[in-house]
A protein has these predicted regions:
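N-terminal export/targeting and maturation segments
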Residues: 2-8
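Intrinsically disordered, low-complexity acidic/polar tracts
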Residues: 10-82
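Short, non-ligating residues that shape and space the ligands of small metal-coordination modules
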Residues: 24, 107-108, 112-115, 133-137
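Alpha-helix-centered segments that form part of catalytic cores
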Residues: 74-98
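Short linker/helix segments within small regulatory modules
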Residues: 88-92, 98-100, 111-125
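Acidic, proline/glycine-rich low-complexity IDRs
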Residues: 122-138
Length: 138
């Protein structure tokens, strides 16, 4: 299967009865535009990166991008909404995923508290089942 140059997939919330989206996960090949035509310049900072991954829609007012060193594997996991596979590649890529529950949840079902600390902002809290969670990019 050929991996697309740019991919945008909604990961559903897996809380019982919830119809919301946990997050939007996007993958683009090095130097390409996202589906919304925005340019990510991480490939200029990380010349070895094959592409970029962007997460949005999980935390309010927050999205983040990071380098992808294996576009084929990352794209394959995103195409089938496999948050566990993405977590295995890099745990920070799927802040909406609880590895203990093996489920993704939207922001409404997480009990997260923001901490704003002079450039070291983060969220901490628990998933719906009470498993501890820490998000260091916000």
């Amino acid at each position: 299967m050929e991996d697309p140059v740019r991919l945008r997939v909604a990961f559903p919330c897996q809380h019982e009865g919830c119809q919301r989206i946990a997050a939007i996960v996007e993958v683009i090949r090095r130097g390409q535009l996202y589906v919304d035509e925005e340019q990510d310049v991480l490939y200029r900072i990380f010349p070895e990166a094959q592409g970029t991954l962007r997460i949005s829609g999980f935390l309010p007012y927050t999205s983040f991008s990071t380098q992808v060193n294996n576009v084929a594997a990352t794209t394959g996991a995103v195409q089938v909404t496999d948050a566990a596979a993405l977590h295995a590649m890099d745990r920070t890529w799927v802040p909406f995923y609880c590895r203990h529950c093996d489920r993704s949840f939207c922001g409404e079902h997480w009990n997260l508290e923001p901490t704003f600390d002079w450039g070291f902002d983060f969220y901490s809290g628990t998933c719906p089942a009470g498993h501890a969670h820490f998000i260091d990019h916000c």
